[in-house]
Amino acid sequence: MTHLSDLDIANQSTLQPIKDIAASVGISEDALEPYGHYKAKIDINKITPRENKGKVVLVTAMSPTPAGEGKSTVTVGLADAFHELNKNVMVALREPALGPTFGIKGGATGGGYAQVLPMEDINLHFNGDFHAITTANNALSAFIDNHIHQGNELGIDQRRIEWKRVLDMNDRALRHVNVGLGGPTNGVPREDGFNITVASEIMAILCLSRSIKDLKDKISRITIGYTRDRKPVTVADLKVEGALAMILKDAIKPNLVQSIEGTPALVHGGPFANIAHGCNSILATETARDLADIVVTEAGFGSDLGAEKFMDIKAREAGFDPAAVVVVATIRALKMHGGVAKDNLKEENVEAVKAGIVNLERHVNNIKKFGVEPVVAINAFIHDTDAEVEYVKSWAKENNVRIALTEVWEKGGKGGVDLANEVLEVIDQPNSFKPLYELELPLEQKIEKIVTEIYGGSKVTFSSKAQKQLKQFKENGWDNYPVCMAKTQYSFSDDQTLLGAPSGFEITIRELEAKTGAGFIVALTGAIMTMPGLPKKPAALNMDVTDDGHAIGLF
């Protein structure tokens, strides 16, 4: 049986005019800023806040295979299922990054009949937010180098500049570069480097800001580097926070699109969850809560990464409690964690599913530690067998875990009704949500708490560099920030080959980064990179554009 590609399905779908989608959730035309017929930005100042805000349903996942487990697909499909049940619902997603689109992942707007549209636009340049973020980030780099070139009044030590340039592309050759070469007229030579745009602190700030004023305040607090006597230098010292916020004045507005089934969708912001905090913008989520009774959103990768950061960073900053958490599981991921090689994942292997269930179990238990009841969604794939699915259902029953087989890829919203009904039962009950740790704990204790309670590790080792940074950050008054772990998504440990539910391992913190604008401390583990590289055969090899301007190969 031949299945249509995601792009084919998207191209065959009929989109509603964006003003009709807006009207369906009460967005007035004067609050709508159309970008063509099917996309728009929303002027949040023209949205009336409501007292009884919508409930937030978070979608996370077990530790994924390299292909991903369909978390975005389930997120969109669950929202469509609520729509099918006549619930007032919106979906809130992150924007895809170009780098992974051309790399290993392809597009990131859901899949099958559970997609947000127009998928070509969203997966490519969309409404220009990432370009604005890239421009603001690199403008700051230009201001820093110009300040040094023009006499360096602030006494910035060019050996201790923390701020890097960014590009929305996977480009390993740019990780370490030299700038200012070619003589005195070209600036002061120094070492620099590039991160991918989604790792930029500007991206995190945009996603954690509540208003233009908040955006400007957070930008002003960015630490760009240090003086020769190790004093922090901020954007406020350079006096360019206003200019940077001006570049972002449109990017901060949430983007409105729609699912295949006409469910309104806010797609805004896109930090990675393995190297950043992995959640869409607070503004988009809060706007959706003012417009809908239920808001379905996602956080990147597994509960150890995106969901933990959603709870400890985003929800804490925004001041809301998630009403329910869906944990996406797939039979292929369970088999991978049960020891099956990538090439054999399509073959039935119930014993491997049994062996791999420990990974799902830990993710389920992680959610419970935040005081929220999890619901497992088995995201169906065509190679799953009845015996494999039945084992997972029986495991859930034995462990009193809510579970539903989800077929939204094939059936759209109708394939997610069972999941929606399970979630409805959870959100109607009170929960006892609380973050994992108190902000008053010392940084090293917050890190140890994440490693031991969420990852299952036994010990945290800090490199000599990280130990010095802990001391320096405490002296600078940064000890009360939440922690954003930078770690592989494939394992609970910092070794991506250690699958299943390992325990007793040590995690090494090799370096810390102070994101004083965004308001968190990044702890880098293992070999995690903030500028990815492309694989040997990138997805770009299968992409093209037709003579009439339509994309080919965006999955």
UniProtKB/Swiss-Prot annotation:
The gene is fhs. This is Formate--tetrahydrofolate ligase. It comes from Staphylococcus aureus (strain NCTC 8325 / PS 47). It comes from the Bacteria. Signal peptide: none annotated. Belongs to the formate--tetrahydrofolate ligase family. Pathway: One-carbon metabolism; tetrahydrofolate interconversion. GO terms for biological process: tetrahydrofolate interconversion. Its EC number is 6.3.4.3. The keyword ATP-binding applies. It holds the Pfam family FTHFS. Keywords: ATP-binding, Ligase, Nucleotide-binding, One-carbon metabolism. ATP binds at residues 65-72.
